[in-house]
């Protein structure tokens, strides 16, 4: 859905605290209650959303600060594919546990970023 309401509690009776209007923004699920999920967004805001409004497709966001360099291969000094500005949202294609690099896609660009340079994947998490 293009609009997702963040509520203060796990029920439609609770007031809406925020309405997200950004598709594929990554969130962290921190609690569950029936058909509701308590989430944390990249800004640290927490609240409840209905589970059917969340997708299992994994995404990332470039946090505030400097541009991130998307590399052709998972190594420092590999050819630059693109520069991703803070706020860019993309798709996590693959992250292997114990590997500092993740294969990602942002728009038409595919390449590799260090997991520490993005928000949306835990330090030792595997994403396939």
Q: Where are the model-predicted features located?
A:
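Boundary regions of SH3-family modules and the immediately adjacent low-complexity/disordered segments
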Residues: 10-12, 19, 26-34, 40-75, ...
């Amino acid at each position: 859905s293009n609009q997702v309401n963040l509520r203060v509690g796990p029920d439609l009776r609770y007031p809406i605290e925020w309405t997200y209007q950004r598709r594929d923004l990554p969130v962290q699920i921190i609690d569950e209650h029936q058909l509701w999920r308590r989430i944390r967004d990249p800004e640290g805001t927490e609240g409840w959303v209905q589970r059917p409004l969340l997708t299992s497709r994994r995404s990332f966001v470039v946090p505030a600060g400097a541009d991130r360099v998307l590399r052709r291969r998972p190594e420092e000094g590999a050819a630059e594919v693109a520069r991703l500005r803070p706020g860019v949202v993309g798709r996590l294609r693959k992250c292997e546990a114990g590997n500092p690099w993740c294969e990602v896609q942002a728009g038409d660009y595919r390449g590799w970023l260090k997991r520490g340079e993005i928000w949306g994947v835990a330090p030792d998490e595997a994403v396939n």
